[in-house]
Amino acid sequence: MDIASTESVSAAAGEAEKLTPCIDLIINNATTASADTMKELPEFNLDLIAPAVDVGAVGPIRVMKAFLPLLKKSPIGALVVNISSEAGSIGKCYRTFYLDYGTEKAALNMLTMTVRNYIKDDPNLNIICIHPGWIRTNPANTEAPLDPYEHAETLRRLFETKRHDKDGPVFVTHTGEPYPW
């Protein structure tokens, strides 16, 4: 599935409908990375921002829209989790780089909140965005404090508590604490 293509996402949803009567959980973890991500404004190629936002912010909402009929059929309540980042927090912004990635994640946060407002009266559907923390996912980040296997269990428990939590915060850390927009 090409998350940047509405046609591709719609086709994937159509295939899923042939295979299952419902979906209980969607985790959107799409992002882009470019050689310019770590560059500051004078060296940054601004043409990279729009594609980053299309993949990392619009893409997850594209997925939710296409899969909405299957999500609404969940017998246990469906949850959509959008993987954001502290880089998308405007209130915590300290960097002079990440012009593409930070913009993408800030846009994802806004779109998540807008969709949350739309589904607020649906007791069977919820959406959150999460800053997952720094995880040891490859040999390049051995200093990361979070073990991926332990972290997966922590996130599973968090997702279960957030499935029906319409009153709690929408942008949270991997421990469920509110994170500044």
Describe the function of each predicted region:
Residues 1-11:
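The beta1-alpha1 cofactor-binding region of Rossmann-like NAD(H)/NADP(H)-dependent oxidoreductases
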Residues 3, 30, 85, 132, ...:
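Active-site loop/turn elements of alpha/beta-hydrolase fold enzymes
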Residues 13, 64, 112, 152-155:
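Short-chain dehydrogenase/reductase
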Residues 15-28, 34-37, 45:
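A glycine-rich helix->loop->beta "capping" turn
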Residues 32-34, 39-53, 58-61, 72-121:
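Catalytic loop of short-chain dehydrogenase/reductase
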Residues 79-81, 126-128, 170:
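Rossmann-like NAD(H)/NADP(H) cofactor-binding core
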Residues 88-90, 120-143:
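Flexible, glycine-rich beta-alpha linker
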Residues 129-132, 141-181:
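C-terminal helical subdomain
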